[in-house]
């Protein structure tokens, strides 16, 4: 009887642990710890005090095409910015809507009729504040501004401050980068999406310092994602084709502000010329893992945006060059990536 009870207990423990994910499956439905699909699109991840925080666009259930717009301007009502937390990068707990839409003021930047895209959060060590920047736009994408919000906690609530046209230029697809020296940069597409700007933020991260560079002029590079390794800065971008996929490109520089040198498409494998039907959004350094960087893509479903999926893939280095090989499934193993399932194709 004792052995039977012990066996039963072991089976129960195994059953409990089987509920938790132990691998990442790019492009498949990814559910949170409550069993609901993760809703954090165009997002980025902050690592703070031993926990990862994933912020993203909270998409509504109804996708529609904005009236009077002559391109595939599909959207949902702006649902604010969501946050999920994780200790292991596999299992994510929903922390709620940390930047809530302003449903009462139709003139607000964050009213549901507006566009809130590509939120990114960084922590300011001097002020102790969590600072969020995002792309703010009107329903027809004519406003093309950058918005900023602040919080005392990584799980909010964030207080929306204002929007602006940084350095007198429009701002659309964007990311943030915090350097080793504590300086932070806002990287965004501008000049009608033709040129990428890299702007140094003020010490409190709440405004632009006036120092900026223009990069890849008239190349229409979009959706920037950036990281730094061994003193070299890397940036992955997409082309500019709306919701539709295109070929990624990566570039390198000795300084965040440039000059940047375009290299090639880093993707390898099936549908590499379409970035595996994804678009870059963020590059996630894995804490405690040498050369552990995860390339985060969104796999957009433009006619049902809430069902857009996530493609997370490990970056592989060959000297100073990087590649992003397609894998059906993979997981983290000590200091290296271990590939599982049917992978390199």
Task: List each model region and its residues.
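Bacterial Sec-dependent N-terminal signal peptides
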Residues: 1-23
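Carbohydrate-active catalytic/glycan-binding domains of CAZyme proteins
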Residues: 20-345
């Amino acid at each position: 009887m004792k052995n039977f009870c012990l066996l039963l207990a072991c089976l129960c423990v195994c059953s409990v642990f089987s509920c938790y994910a132990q691998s990442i499956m790019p492009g498949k439905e990814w559910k949170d710890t409550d069993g609901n699909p993760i809703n954090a699109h165009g997002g980025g991840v902050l690592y703070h005090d031993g926990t990862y925080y994933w912020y993203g666009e909270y998409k509504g259930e109804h996708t529609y095409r904005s009236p009077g717009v002559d391109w595939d301007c599909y959207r949902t009502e702006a649902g604010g910015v969501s946050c999920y937390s994780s200790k292991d990068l596999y299992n994510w707990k929903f922390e709620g809507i940390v930047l809530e839409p302003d449903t009462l003021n139709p003139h607000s930047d964050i009213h549901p009729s507006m566009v809130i895209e590509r939120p990114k959060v960084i922590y300011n060590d001097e002020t102790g504040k969590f600072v969020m920047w995002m792309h703010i736009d009107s329903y027809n994408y004519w406003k093309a501004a950058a918005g900023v919000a602040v919080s005392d906690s990584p799980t909010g609530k964030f207080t929306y401050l204002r929007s602006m046209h940084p350095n007198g230029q429009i701002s659309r697809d964007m990311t943030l980068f915090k350097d080793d020296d504590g300086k932070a940069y806002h990287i965004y597409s501008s000049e009608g999406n033709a040129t990428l700007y890299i702007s140094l933020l003020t010490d409190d991260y709440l405004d632009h310092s006036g120092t900026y560079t223009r990069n890849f002029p008239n190349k229409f590079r979009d959706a920037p994602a950036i990281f730094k390794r061994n003193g070299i800065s890397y940036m992955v971008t997409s082309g500019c084709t709306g919701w539709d996929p295109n070929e990624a490109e990566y570039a390198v520089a000795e300084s965040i502000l440039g000059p940047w040198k375009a290299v090639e498409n880093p993707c390898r494998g099936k549908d590499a010329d379409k970035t595996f039907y994804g678009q870059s959004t963020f590059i996630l350094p894995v804490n405690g893992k040498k050369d552990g960087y995860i390339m985060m893509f969104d796999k957009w479903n433009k006619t049902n945006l809430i069902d857009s999926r996530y493609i997370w893939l490990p970056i592989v280095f060959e000297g100073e060059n990087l590649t992003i090989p397609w894998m059906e499934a993979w997981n983290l193993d000590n200091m290296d990536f271990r590939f599982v399932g049917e992978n390199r194709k």
